[in-house]
Amino acid sequence: MKLLFNLEYQTTFGEELMLNILTHGVGAESPSASANNVEGPKQSNGDVVARHKMSTADGLHWSCQLTIAEKDCSCIDYYYTLVRGDQELRHEWLVAPHRLELAANKGARYTIYDHWNDIPEDSYMYSSAFTECVAARRCNQSVATDYDRTVRIKVRASQLRSNERLAMLGSTEALGCWEALGARTMTEHSCNEWVISLNADVLPDTFEFKFVVLDEENDVTPVWENGMNRTICLPPMEKGEVVVYELPQAWFPVYPWKGAGTVIPVFSLRSEGSFGVGDFGDLKLMIDWCDKTRQRILQVLPINDTTNTHTWQDSYPYNAISIYALHPQFCDFRQMPAIKDEAIRNHYEQLRLELNALPQIDYERVYDAKMGYLRQLFQQEWGSVSRRESYKLFFEQNKEWLLPYAAFSYYRDLYGTAVFGEWPEEATLAAATEHPSAKAKKEMQFWYFVQYYLDMQMHDAHNYARQHRVILKGDIPIGISRDGVEAWVEPKYFNLNGQAGAPPDPLPLEMNACLPGCVWNATPRSLSPLERNIGFWTQA
């Protein structure tokens, strides 16, 4: 099977275009382009990029022909880059690469006409807040066709809601002769990109058409796209030929999406079933309220662990000791196994009722009570939890931050302070993780146990929000705690002698957050999650 990619892009002397094929998964084969095949980089998600040089006769019209085995793959994702020698000058928007589906059963030669895709003005519509929540729709592969000659039309349309779909209406009988009832429904084969296959044998050489939006739930008049009719002039086509047109984005006369929402700290969501403080179970109740009041955004204040002094001062949510770990106070005991010992269970139930009846949250009593409950559960459940496949997967995926966090928490409680500069020299990460004492190992396992349940409950609340089409929006501090895990493990990235905050504004107020600043000229070497994050922000 032959694939001929075409792109119009004006270049200057010395510049070249490259076609970059993404091969998903280990061992995937890349299409062959003989001597023009160049080894490319590996993406952060594990995809391998195979680069192919394109050719041109005028510096404007670029093309590249590839050959693949007919059963090698069902679709190809790719993007274009502009290079000068070994230097990459720019590349397309990588969030939504081009997708070519090999959906024509009789297709032996594909001719693809693309256009360069920069970051669109509505790029936010490609975020998970829309594609997986507010405007979530199921993407599907195109149905295979048996046409002798096939025309495939692709277009991006990001304004559609979850109950809407894209269709084509045109001047030919195959496209409904401009009658709404004859509109041809398209397939969303990737987020916000729609495609349709047409039988070229029943199409005239030139035809006009427009894209329309259909409502799947209500029988209403289709919404027609803005602008003049689109026109396609088909080239001569032989049997087995497929021509693919990627068209400019479709825009419709609809208002931009707007959503109302609420900002709230999770600890304030105390309900009748709480344990003296709002938790991740109560977060679901708040999501229900947002949905019933037609709010689409729920922003929560930071939910990271702030346990520093074991006093009420730890209630400040913007001084987290870890940028990853969640606060133990948000554990919902209703979603965890019950304590089997009846006397202990009744004790904590009475304590729960007492703490829940307080007019204000007693941070210290609630924290101590919930930690005592969690330690009882740990003694009871750790043996079975540690053997679960879900726990093993959680630990493997998060051990880069989980081990330092557990070690830090162990030392903090052992020495009675989170100021790691006051710990003895032997209190190192290596000592706690490589050759721990029995006590240290048990204590660190407790923190693994707590974070495992917190992770499950937070994921459950997040999925619940998506099911109700409520965007669960987070909040983060402006920096790390000077007495936290990151400062302890990787101090080279932080100015621990400085303090960051907010400068005065027109109201001549300022705020000293007492957080250390970042050392931005430290070279990230991708040796840890924090270093990768710094690399991302400095390169963004």
Q: Predicted regions span which residues?
A:
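A short, amphipathic beta-strand motif
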Residues: K2-E8, T150-R156
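Structured loops at beta-to-helix junctions and adjacent beta-edge loops in soluble globular domains
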Residues: E8, L22, R156, S171, ...
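Aromatic-rich carbohydrate-binding modules that target alpha-glucans
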Residues: Q10-S74, V83-N105, A157-P204, L214-M237, ...
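Compositionally biased low-complexity segments at domain edges in trafficked proteins
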Residues: G107-R149, S158-R161, E238-R270
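Extended acidic/polar, glycine-enriched regions
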Residues: N226-V254, G281-D282, I297, T306
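Acidic/aromatic-lined carbohydrate-recognition and catalytic surfaces
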Residues: P253-P491, L527-L530
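Non-catalytic scaffold segments within catalytic domains of secreted glycoside hydrolases
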Residues: E443, I476-G479, D483-Q539
